[in-house]
Curated annotation (Swiss-Prot):
Source organism: Pinus thunbergii
Biological process according to GO: DNA-templated transcription
Name of the protein this chain belongs to: DNA-directed RNA polymerase subunit alpha
EC number of the protein: 2.7.7.6
Family (UniProt): Belongs to the RNA polymerase alpha chain family.
Domain notes per entry: The N-terminal domain is essential for RNAP assembly and basal transcription, whereas the C-terminal domain is involved in interaction with transcriptional regulators and with upstream promoter elements.
Source taxon at top rank: Eukaryota
Coiled-coil segments on the chain, per record: none
Encoding gene per record: rpoA
Function according to Swiss-Prot or TrEMBL: DNA-dependent RNA polymerase catalyzes the transcription of DNA into RNA using the four ribonucleoside triphosphates as substrates.
Region annotated Alpha N-terminal domain (alpha-NTD), chain positions: 1-233
Lineage, top ranks: Eukaryota, Viridiplantae, Streptophyta, Embryophyta, Tracheophyta
Pfam families (alphabetical): RNA_pol_A_bac, RNA_pol_A_CTD, RNA_pol_L
CDD domains, per database record: RNAP_alpha_NTD (cd06928)
Location of region: Alpha C-terminal domain (alpha-CTD): 264-335
Oligomer and partners: In plastids the minimal PEP RNA polymerase catalytic core is composed of four subunits: alpha, beta, beta', and beta''. When a (nuclear-encoded) sigma factor is associated with the core the holoenzyme is formed, which can initiate transcription.
Length: 335
């Protein structure tokens, strides 16, 4: 069915939601298709979208809890069935939706005996709980429970050092990722020079955002990454012009050469693309056809490996070696 729709308008590139389900309040699923794409583009977009969905989409969760007269995470509270640790873990699992940025304050004030759920949290107007039935604690006696919460909207995650507790304040390891998982697959159709691709993207969220909203935010974040390149010439950014002899790299080479950490060095080499090395077109195109796109990719090849690349002769190898030695003082191994 999708293939028939695509053949009607081969020139119109568009996203289409082909499946949407809510398995529960905290598990939503969406499947989307982007088409038609030229051969090779679906994989490029799929990789970028998956990374943006899993790492760049913002979420809201509890980052700090304050309990009066409690000194330790594993303390037992008279009249409450759960330990402090269990209460913190239950609070960590609560899924929020927020329209505002920054830190917000919330609280729980309950008199037992009774069960305490997410519905008992007193929230600011801009914050909403996705599943109000989520369990927090069970008060077994006629006691008063007063809990102060700090809620934050952010992206990625925050890991606190252990035993970092003072005056009953307990930081919580926060995972701000509303996207639980994201996968993509590619379907090709056509033949010869008319091969086209359909990118299928599957998204699972915790209900803090719908899959469609997560897709929109991830797409917007990717677009924002490239906006500086569009205005780079107007802003006259140092090192971004293409004049002969100029430094095309966005950072000094000394940062790469003096970095003694292997991991940091690899990250730096991943940021340098082979088109920045000003290699001859024939040499550059041969490297691209061999899926060598960054300096890190290139350094994974020995001299003998380079000689085995199609249409890559001794002259091309010497050109690469000269550039590596001149710019980075690097001499690849012979085998």
């Amino acid at each position: 069915m999708i293939r028939d729709e695509i053949s009607v308008s081969i020139q119109t590139l568009r996203w289409k939601c082909i499946e949407s389900r809510a398995y529960s309040k905290r598990l939503h699923y969406g499947r989307f298709a982007l088409s038609p794409l030229h051969k090779g583009r679906a994989d490029t977009i799929g990789i970028a979208m998956r990374r943006a969905l899993l790492g760049e989409v913002e979420g809201t969760c509890i980052t700090r809890v304050k309990l009066e007269n409690i000194k330790h995470e594993y303390s037992a509270i008279i009249g409450i069935e759960e330990s402090v640790h269990d209460i913190l873990m239950n609070l960590k699992e609560i899924v929020f939706r927020s329209d505002s940025y920054g830190i917000r304050e919330a609280s729980i004030y309950i008199v037992g005996p009774r069960n305490v759920t997410a519905q008992d949290i007193i929230l600011p107007p801009s914050v909403k709980i996705i599943d109000t039935t989520q369990h927090i604690a069970r008060l077994t006696k006629s006691i008063t429970s007063d809990i102060r919460l700090q809620i934050e909207k952010n992206r990625g995650y925050i890991i606190h050092s252990p035993n970092n507790y003072q005056d009953g304040i307990f930081p919580i390891d926060a995972v701000f990722m509303p996207v639980r998982d994201a996968n993509y697959s590619i379907h090709s159709y056509g033949s010869g020079n008319e091969i086209r691709e359909v990118l299928f993207l599957e998204i699972w969220t915790n209900g803090g955002l719908t899959p469609r909203e997560a897709l929109y935010e991830a797409s917007r974040n990717l677009i924002d990454l490239f906006i500086p390149f569009l205005h780079g010439e107007e802003q006259n950014i140092d090192g971004m012009n293409n004049k002969k002899g100029s430094n095309m790299l966005p950072f000094p080479l000394s940062h790469v050469l003096t970095d003694t950490g292997e991991t940091k060095e690899k990250i730096a080499f991943q940021l340098i693309f082979i088109d920045q090395l000003e290699l001859p077109p024939k040499t550059y195109n041969s490297l691209r056809r061999a899926n060598i796109h960054t300096l890190l990719d290139l350094l994974n090849y020995s001299r003998e490996d380079l000689m085995r690349i199609e249409h890559f002769g001794k002259e091309s190898v010497e050109q690469v070696l000269e550039v590596l030695q001149k710019l980075f003082a690097i001499d690849p191994p012979r085998n």
